[in-house]
Amino acid sequence: MKKKIIAICIGVILIVGMIITYIVLKPSTEETNLTKINLAEVTHSAFYAPLYVAIEDGYLEEEGIEVELILTPGADKVAAAVLSGDLEIGFAGTESAIYVYDGGEEDYLVTFAGLTKRDGQFIIGKEKDFDWSSLEGKEVLVGRKGGMPALNFLNALKNAGIDASKVNINYSIDFASLSGAYIGGTGDFVNLFEPNATLLEKEEYGYVVASIGELSGEMPYTAFYARK
């Protein structure tokens, strides 16, 4: 009788162990049904908060999508990563997709959704007092020539009635290095997204003096694209 009870106990333990192992190792239905997408993100900024909320709060998973963000500084590099097939989706300025199309690429990039419709850059200066004419004769760090931040800054200058030829626009510093260059003493003004703009002011390297988006108006500033 004692041997029988021991055998039953061992059997129960084995069954319970098998059930636990099955539950732990079996992928959930939700996991197996998710389509994983690698998304090239041009920069990480509070400006893109809706995207982060959609990922963290599970809104994309509800649609069957699992997104992994890959920081890829520079819209040109985002476009290259998508064209090469290294990443499925690009998230950057729409100008990068236009350049690819104009270049005659057969499998060009197609923009299928937008996130931001206004420039999120702020101008940082060394003095609190500012009007747009303050930029005349001064060096302004704007990032890569032909990039959306630089193009939109030119648009803001035009809308402010400022002749761009009277502003020393520095295109030589890549977008990801703008804060460091300005802290290091390059330029009189620099155009930055948040949180970098506020951080520079907090660390007393300058003052947030103007919003570029306020003057440049609405436009498809940052969007999602994939190969045709």
Residue spans for each PLM region:
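Short helix- or helix-capping micro-motifs
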Residues: 200
